[in-house]
Curated annotation (Swiss-Prot):
Homohexamer. Organized in a ring with a central cavity. It is found in: Cytoplasm. It is an enzyme of class 3 (hydrolase). The active site is at S697, K740. Keywords: ATP-binding, Cytoplasm, Hydrolase, Nucleotide-binding, Protease, Serine protease, Stress response. GO terms for molecular function: ATP binding; ATP hydrolysis activity; ATP-dependent peptidase activity; sequence-specific DNA binding; serine-type endopeptidase activity. GO terms for cellular component: cytoplasm. It comes from Bacillus thuringiensis (strain Al Hakam). GO terms for biological process: cellular response to heat; protein quality control for misfolded or incompletely synthesized proteins. This is Lon protease. SUPFAM superfamilies: P-loop containing nucleoside triphosphate hydrolases, PUA domain-like, Ribosomal protein S5 domain 2-like. Belongs to the peptidase S16 family. InterPro entries: AAA+_ATPase, ATPase_AAA_core, Lon_bac, Lon_bac/euk-typ, Lon_lid, Lon_proteolytic, Lon_Prtase, Lon_prtase_N.
Length: 794
């Protein structure tokens, strides 16, 4: 609603006594709601009216002395206001002129008459009418009122001089007004205040109170204008200083150009300064960077230190300080990506989905620090990349294998020639975001020497309570790593220091079963190798039984790395046949695998074909997963020597001695000659002799093999066993049960004897493996012997 405001210089209706010469009884008049415009009594202005009900109200007023009630809406965006949407106090006005415009709207000239209050809201079909009653002003006409009028005029005059938004002619018009109420209304209309405040002034009946209110409002406006003026002066001075600096720098450039000095760094410094200010780095870091920049500006370009500082500035600006990728908080989609890239590995996938779920609820969770432990080839590194994809995060990998210098992690101090940041800061630069998935690969392969311990430097990186303030020796300023999701990989935990291990969440990844390997080969390895060797699915078909043949007789691993190499070999052979023999299709079956890969490399099935005396099959946990361990015992006449061979470690030797002592203490019960240790030499050998072996879990296996050799009772070829033995014959729990069980399954064993306390670990073993194995839970060696020795009553 547009308006042109004009004020009458005469008192049309009232002032000085009664408010109006009109009938003060209640009367019904049409309502014209106003949006963002307020009309005071005696005000004349143009209004553009376009709403249907408003046009109908004007037409209704034309039939009844052109009288209409003007009331302001509380909210401007309401097109059809109801009773609660308009203010109850408004102005009765007279329509002086009405003109219809080409666009269908009406332009009307109205003149405010007096204040009125709505008594009843009457809404009809096409028009809204209101029952109103006249509001009479409270005029006292005393000396205080005159003093207030004079004070108001003085403040208004000062306001006009400062603001320069009101003309002197307007002030002259205002100064001629003698009625206090009209004076207050006239000044209120010229003040740049909100319409809500203007409505409040309209609703004030007491003229004195209205004058007081306006004096207070003008004083507030004067203070605001004074503050604006001060701020403007500060801005002006700042701009003048900036312009002066710019002018001087331009002069310096011109002088350098005239002198032929090409080493001036003015433009470069300004560019660096702008980049620093826009980088988003913390305030303290920014101060340090600007301080270094000032040093750089003063140094000659030929100075060696100038190059050091410039390199430092480049590193600071290359780091991500605020840039972050938005996490994909879609559990279903993330799970789909993880399942597509990797088969199995449910624990890791579940942990990632748990992190996403908590992140969705809190949006403030620190990045987890995971450590994936498992044998080579099970997909630890590639899984970390899939985690990054599922989270929609950038991925960066740092290999820690062979790192033995603490400066590799923390960087070198800038005082050294060729100093650089450590691998963590270098990785963050590559990541280009503050929340990447950061892979610390082969964390168990670090070592230490006289230059420091890199694993100790990682303690700060992998501590959620400290890594928000990580300090690199080169950067020398704190860098926030708390939003990074660290994923470490290791083949074994034994070489990782305890404090570092304590900071990580360990997730063990055991080897794959045969069925899992077949699935991985079918869905992932074979399509990849076909593509790399230029073959199509129609050129080479590998049946499942052929894949199983390759897994059993050409690989002996927990992962699938060797399996992939063997499949690649099959593809190469097939490619050669297709090119030379011009055959378009090759089908690999169980029978022709030997033609492509040659003779079997490994023997699948039972370690021994017959039950043997003095030989028992143990289960071992290695860096490559699990494996079977044949333990041989030979008894020969001698002087009671106990010989241990097979490159055994101290713990394994002590297990053999504990088993030997247990058998001596129960020789009669076991039906063994009590003096056997004096008349015989006993030799325990654990092949392969060149491979180091250690650990307590072969205790019951050595005890069983010893008893078998001393009693002449053979050990069942179908049984594998694992467990630590005590001098009392108790069987203690061991670790790595899943890996050991998978190795027993690969070897074709059908029965496994394990400590009773390891029963809880059976849940981790795949059902496809459990179906083919019988588990015997033993708490004492007697139970082991019942199931391991052939012919012993159970």
């Amino acid at each position: 609603m547009y308006c042109n405001i004009k004020w009458l210089n005469r008192s049309l209706i009232y002032y000085g006594g009664a408010m109006s010469s009109m009938n003060t009884n209640e009367r019904i008049v049409p309502l014209l709601p106003l949006r963002g415009v307020l009309v005071y009594p005696t005000m004349v202005l143009h209004l553009d009216v376009g709403r249907d009900k408003s046009i109908q109200a004007l037409e209704q007023a034309a039939m009844d002395e052109n009288i209409i009630f003007l009331a302001m809406q509380k909210e401007m965006n309401i097109d059809d206001p109801k009773e609660d949407d308009i203010y109850s106090v408004g102005t009765v006005a007279k329509v002086k002129q009405m003109l219809k415009l080409p666009n269908g709207t009406l332009r009307v000239l109205v003149e405010g008459l007096h204040r009125a209050e709505v008594v009843e809201f009457i809404e009809e079909e096409n028009v809204v009418q209101v029952s109103i009653k006249t509001v009479t002003e409270e005029v006292e006409a005393d000396l205080e009122e005159k003093a207030l009028m004079r004070t108001l005029l003085e403040h208004f005059e000062q306001y006009i001089k400062v603001s320069k938004k009101v003309s002197n002619e307007t002030f002259a018009t205002v100064a001629d007004v003698e009625e206090p109420g009209r004076l207050a209304d006239l000044i209120a209309s010229h003040l740049p205040i909100k319409t809500k405040q203007k409505q409040e002034i309209l609703e004030i009946i007491s003229v004195k109170e209205r004058l007081h209110t306006l004096i207070s409002i003008i004083q507030d406006e004067q203070e605001l204008l004074s503050l604006e003026k001060k701020i403007g002066q500060k801005v002006k001075r700042s701009m003048e200083r900036t312009q002066k600096e710019y002018f001087l720098r331009e002069q310096m450039k011109a002088i350098q150009t005239e002198l032929g000095d090409k080493e001036g760094k003015g433009g470069e410094v300004e560019e660096l300064r702008e980049k620093i200010e826009q980088s988003g780095m913390p305030e303290e870091t920014m101060k340090a960077a600007l301080k270094e920049l000032d040093r750089y500006e003063k140094l000659p370009a030929s100075s060696a230190e100038s190059g050091v500082i410039r390199n430092y500035m480049d590193w600071l600006l290359a780091l991500p300080w605020t840039d972050a990728t938005e996490d994909m908080i879609d559990l279903a989609h993330s799970e789909e990506i993880l399942n597509k890239d990797h088969y199995g590995l449910e624990k890791v996938k579940e942990r990632v989905l748990e992190y996403l779920a908590v992140q969705k609820l809190t949006n403030s969770l620190k990045g987890p620090i995971l450590c994936l432990v498992g044998p080579p080839g099970v997909g630890k590194t590639s899984l970390a990349r899939s985690i990054a994809t599922s989270l929609n995060r950038n991925f960066v990998r740092v290999s820690l294998g062979g790192v033995r210098d603490e400066s590799e992690i923390r960087g070198h101090r800038r005082t050294y020639v060729g100093a650089m940041p450590g691998r963590i800061i270098q990785g963050m630069k590559k990541a280009k975001s503050v929340n990447p998935v950061f892979l610390l690969d082969e964390i168990d392969k670090m070592s230490n020497d006289f230059r420091g311990d890199p694993s100790a430097a990682l303690l700060e990186v992998l501590d959620p309570e400290q890594n928000h303030n990580f300090s690199d020796h080169y950067i020398e300023e704190p860098y926030d790593l708390s939003k990074v999701m660290f994923v470490a990989t290791a083949n074994t935990l034994s070489s990782i220091p305890g404090p570092l291990l304590d900071r990580m969440e360990i997730i063990s990844i055991a080897g794959y079963t045969e069925l899992e390997k077949v699935h991985i080969a079918r869905e992932h390895l074979l399509p990849k190798q076909l593509q790399e060797h230029g073959l199509r699915k129609g050129n080479l078909q590998v049946r499942d039984e052929a894949l199983l043949e390759i897994i059993r007789y050409y690989t002996r691993e927990a992962g699938v790395r060797t399996l992939e190499r063997q499949i690649a070999k099959v593809c190469r052979k097939a490619a050669k046949i297709i090119v030379t023999a011009e055959r378009k299709r090759i089908v690999v079956t169980e029978k022709n695998v030997v033609d492509l890969l040659g003779k079997h490399i490994f023997r699948y099935g039972q370690a021994e074909k017959t039950d043997q005396v003095g030989m028992a099959t143990g289960l071992a946990y290695t860096a490559a997963g699990g494996d079977t361990l044949a333990i041989e015992v030979s008894v020969a006449p001698g002087k009671g020597k106990l010989i241990l061979t097979g490159k055994l470690g101290d713990v394994m030797k002590e297990s053999a001695q504990a088993a030997f002592s247990y058998i001596r203490s129960r020789a009669e019960e076991l039906q063994i000659d009590p003096d056997f240790h004096e008349k015989n030499d006993i030799h325990i050998h654990v092949p392969e002799g060149a491979v180091p072996k250690d650990g307590p879990s072969a205790g019951i296996t050595m005890a069983t093999a010893l008893i078998s050799a001393l009693t002449g009772i053979p050990v069942s070829k179908e049984v594998g066993m694992t467990g630590e033995i005590t001098l009392r014959g108790r069987v203690l729990p061991i670790g790595g049960l899943k890996e050991k069980t998978l190795s027993a399954h690969r070897a074709g064993l059908t029965k496994i004897i394990l400590p009773a306390e390891n029963e809880k670990d059976l849940d981790d073993i795949p059902e496809s493996v459990k179906e083919n194995l019988t588990f015997v839970l033993a708490s004492h060696l007697d139970e082991v012997l019942e199931h391991a020795l052939v012919g012993v009553k159970q």
